[in-house]
Curated annotation (Swiss-Prot):
This is ER lumen protein-retaining receptor. It comes from the Eukaryota. The chain crosses the membrane at residues 3-21, 36-53, 62-80, 97-110, 118-137, 150-168, 179-199. Belongs to the ERD2 family. One of its GO terms (biological process) is protein transport. The gene is KdelR. The keyword Isomerase does not apply. GO terms for cellular component: cis-Golgi network; endoplasmic reticulum; endoplasmic reticulum membrane. Required for the retention of luminal endoplasmic reticulum proteins. Determines the specificity of the luminal ER protein retention system. Also required for normal vesicular traffic through the Golgi.
Length: 212
């Protein structure tokens, strides 16, 4: 495993920790898109169905369990334990507009037309756009709390580092995956405007605001 993938995984785990601590400490999920969290849960469920059938390494298995458990915990906290604090009115993105195209695309463009491979491909496509409801929520409310901004930055950094991981693997191993690379580019592009605002505002102690 190369340093870029490891750093990306750490950034991903850090983002999850920030999110869960934010919800638990404030006893509120205000400012967090439950729809994005549902999409991420679907991503992990469809990607890691091979958890009990395919063993790669202890590290790989631990990360799979971690992402499945934390995504489930996040959805539980938002829709059950702290349901009263969830902003239903602003979190109004139509996620079927993401789910259906990703499902259709995974049936048409995949590495192999098998159930597991199609589901894996679906998870890759869906992850690339799963953050859209969160960005839409921030845009509708007009601003994001600093802790939410840190969460989004860590999540975006994870994907950017994974792109570097693919560059490294191509240069060192002559290995590449066009589906993963394309989805990673799409996801990173979605974060670009946020990255700019994060660096120019949040790091200077100002509130992050996205254009409506």
């Amino acid at each position: 495993m190369n340093i870029f993938r490891f750093a990306g995984d750490l950034s991903h785990v850090f983002a999850i920790i920030i999110l869960l601590l934010k919800i638990w400490k404030t006893r509120s999920c205000a400012g967090i898109s439950g729809k994005s969290q549902i999409l991420f849960a679907v991503v992990y469920l469809t990607r890691y169905l091979d958890l009990f059938t395919t063993y790669v390494s202890l590290y790989n298995s631990v990360m799979k369990v971690l992402f499945l458990a934390t995504s489930g915990a996040t959805v539980y906290l938002m829709y059950v334990k702290f349901k009263a604090t969830y902003d239903h009115n602003h979190d109004s993105f139509r996620i079927e507009f993401l789910l259906v195209p990703c499902a259709l695309l995974s049936l048409v463009i995949n590495h192999e037309f098998t159930v597991m491979e199609v589901l894996w491909t679906f998870s890759i496509y869906l992850e690339s756009v799963a953050i859209l409801p969160q960005l839409f929520l921030v845009s509708r409310t007009g601003e994001a709390e600093s802790i939410t901004s840190h969460y989004l930055f860590a999540l975006g950094s994870y994907r950017a580092l994974y792109l570097l991981n693919w560059v490294y693997r191509y240069m060192v191993e002559s290995h590449y995956d066009l589906i993963a690379i394309f989805a990673g580019v799409v996801q990173t592009v979605l974060y670009c405007d946020f990255f700019y605002l994060y660096i120019t505002k949040v790091l200077k102690g100002k509130k992050l605001q996205l254009p409506a």
